[in-house]
Amino acid sequence: MPVIKVRENESFDVALRRFKRSCEKAGILAEVRAREFYEKPTTIRKRENATRAKRHAKRVARENARNTRLY
């Protein structure tokens, strides 16, 4: 769990913002959302494969767009 030390003469809002930023960097909220409901290992693999395929298609489309001639 991220811990911050409130500096001298630091407002509560600034300290809260620093804490939120440290939680975001640690990935705590994403972890909580992922663990909120049980997900079967097959659905995890299926979702990861889908994101992998989407990323690959995006990369290929970007390379093809770069290689097309514009005349």
UniProtKB/Swiss-Prot annotation:
Q: Name one GO molecular function term.
A: structural constituent of ribosome
**Could you give one GO CC term from the UniProt record?**
ribosome
Record keywords:
Ribonucleoprotein, Ribosomal protein
Which InterPro entries does the UniProt entry name for this protein?
Ribosomal_bS21, Ribosomal_bS21_CS, Ribosomal_bS21_sf
The region called Disordered is annotated at: 47-71
Q: Where is the composition biased (Basic and acidic residues)?
A: 60-71
Q: Where is the signal peptide, in residue numbers?
A: none
Its Gene Ontology biological processes? Answer: translation
Tell me which NCBIfam families the record gives: S21p (TIGR00030)
Give the UniProt family note.
Answer: Belongs to the bacterial ribosomal protein bS21 family.
Q: What is the official name of this protein in its record?
A: Small ribosomal subunit protein bS21
Report the source organism: Actinobacillus succinogenes (strain ATCC 55618 / DSM 22257 / CCUG 43843 / 130Z)
Gene name, per UniProt, is: rpsU
